[in-house]
Amino acid sequence: MKLIKAILSDILIFYERIISYCYWNFKGVRITFLCQVSRKAKIESGCLFTGNSIITENASVGSFTYGHNVNINNATIGEYCSLAPDVKIGLDEHPLDKESTHPHFYKKIIQKKSIISNHVWIGANAIILCDVIVGSHSVIAAGAVVTKNVDEKTIVGGIPSRVINTIRNN
């Protein structure tokens, strides 16, 4: 019986991917078949997501933003953002003052959103935690862990991230 339930579950996941793939590509958002993109997410046309990208129902993405193998949850992302491979934005938090950090031991936490403004470039393997605002035209270096807000036209990197430089327009 457990095997049958597991097979049925896999079949349902497969059909959900087909429906999601058709839904988003029809709306002008290009996703590849392996992506898991909620139909409740808000994604503008012109976006491209490839690989095993995951975009949850709590996400909002502006037009012409793209990414490969990205994980977007509890986040609002602006237009024309470049997300390098394996970027993670707005991951869930767990309480540290409970018996356990496992979700069975506490009530659901209301997650705070991350906000990524327009024209932001986020390097490979960067992580942007919940409740962080990244200003427009900023750059997040590869592998950075962003725990605090980033001003516009700022380059940050490191763990935790710190300001590396500012961007000056010519």
Where are the model-predicted features located?
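Soluble, non-transmembrane catalytic domains of enzymes that act on hydrophobic metabolites at membranes
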Residues: 39, 45, 53-55, 154
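Membrane-proximal basic amphipathic "stem/tether" segments
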Residues: 1-39
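Short, T/G/N/S-enriched strand-turn elements that build extracellular solenoid repeat scaffolds
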Residues: 38-40, 59, 150
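Conserved G/P- and acidic residue-centered "switch" motifs that form tight phosphate/ATP-binding loops
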Residues: 140, 158
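Beta-rich strand-turn-strand
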Residues: 124-138, 144-147
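Glycine-centered loop/turn positions within well-structured domains
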Residues: 97, 148, 152-154, 162
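Flexible, glycine/small-residue-enriched loop-and-beta-strand segment within the central core
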Residues: 48-132, 160, 167-168
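Catalytic binding pocket for nucleotide-activated donors in carbohydrate/polymer assembly enzymes
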Residues: 152-157, 168-170
